[in-house]
Amino acid sequence: MYLSDGKKETQYIVKDIGLPTGIEKRLEALGMTRGTSVTVLNSKSKGILIVKVRGTRFALGRNITEHISVAT
C-alpha cells in the first residue's frame, strides 16, 4: 500500500521510499525514514496529503506520496 492511498486519521509505518535521492534526503531531514510512524491528518481535494511525522505536520503532494510504501 502507498501513502497516497492512506485514510484520514490513520497511522502507518513507512516501509520504503522510492523517490530520487534528493527528495528522499529532504524527507529524511523532516524525520520521515523507513520504520517511522506516519499519521494521515487530512487529504485535500487537489492531491495534497497532510501528514504528521514525529510531532511535525507537513503537506506532501500525491506525486511524492504515491512513491512511499507503508503498512498499517
Model-derived segments and their meaning:
Residues 1-72:
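Compact, glycine-rich, soluble single-domain proteins
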